[in-house]
């Protein structure tokens, strides 16, 4: 704020006019900097986001295009035409990157690993990286630590921000922060450490140990983690991990029971399980609750990453069998309406299917049955058969990509 005040006063002194328009350096801005600029009467702000400026575009987020390499008139006309009417919908060719494989306690080794990653990304010709921002060295799907400074979890290394910047600046890809929504392993002494998802009495718990989305302490903690992520790195989007689910026996924690009662539902999972009508309402309530909480985290991130895109993992079984919503608290229609992208886990052998190609064909047909859904769905293909730990035949993968 002091810099903007000083610069504004200097311009007014030298020109007799106070500045009213601010072009953000490298297009970088967030809600706080916009508020500061607006408070100094610079209410028109220029970003580096491509696109047209329609009448509903806010003045504090005016799009502009950088003209590079001195294009001729024809090339410039094509670029501008593409902005107004792209020849084909935006596509996503994505690679998942697990920072646990880049991290090393030896800084030299870690730097070499990062360099190899950049080379690999360039060679693959992709346009998007889902970059894991949390540490899961034991592979149980729960964040034991994270790769950015934060208030609640151990920081294994301050690696995410650097890797995201290197990937975006040196390879040109869009980087999405790949994050759990609920699966955080807080230190034992943390006030919210035991506010976890609980299964109905006598039933096994789900695949992941998760903080319950119905506890205010847990929600506040997760919100802080997302706020710290947004403050300490620059990235294009967020991918919510496949932990954002509640099965047919969850959640029966005290906080969840209280939330059910407030929503007019029976107060326990067992009571709802015994009533078909209540059970259906319970399923919908859980699905809506997970989506609503993820939307809150999106709003938290957008305070620092205003042009953030969003994606969320969905299990294939939910797409193939709508009744499976009960087992996952997920819905394809709900996700299509609430995120820029749906990241569909198209992994036949994970789902127990013996026919790889047929499974993918069924998935594509199920998504295509919804108008416009294919354009918003990215199919995450299984490249390794985890049962045998052997790579899947390249021709099967190529065939799936061509569908």
Describe the residue ranges of each PLM region.
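Catalytic domains of carbohydrate-active enzymes, especially glycoside hydrolases
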Residues: 112-139, 232-237, 335-343, 403
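The substrate-binding groove and active-site-proximal loops of carbohydrate-active enzymes
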Residues: 20, 66-67, 93-108, 144-157, ...
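Aromatic-lined substrate-binding rim segments of carbohydrate-active enzymes
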Residues: 115-118, 122, 135-183, 278-305
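Conserved, mostly hydrophobic/aromatic
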Residues: 7, 22, 37, 121, ...
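Active-site-adjacent "subsite" loops/lids of carbohydrate-active enzymes
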Residues: 88-111, 164-165, 174-233, 268-276
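C-terminal active-site subregion of NodB/CE4 polysaccharide deacetylases
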Residues: 1-93
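Polysaccharide-binding and catalytic clefts of secreted carbohydrate-active enzymes
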Residues: 1, 120, 199-350
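Active-site clefts of carbohydrate-active enzymes
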Residues: 88-100, 277, 308-319, 365-399
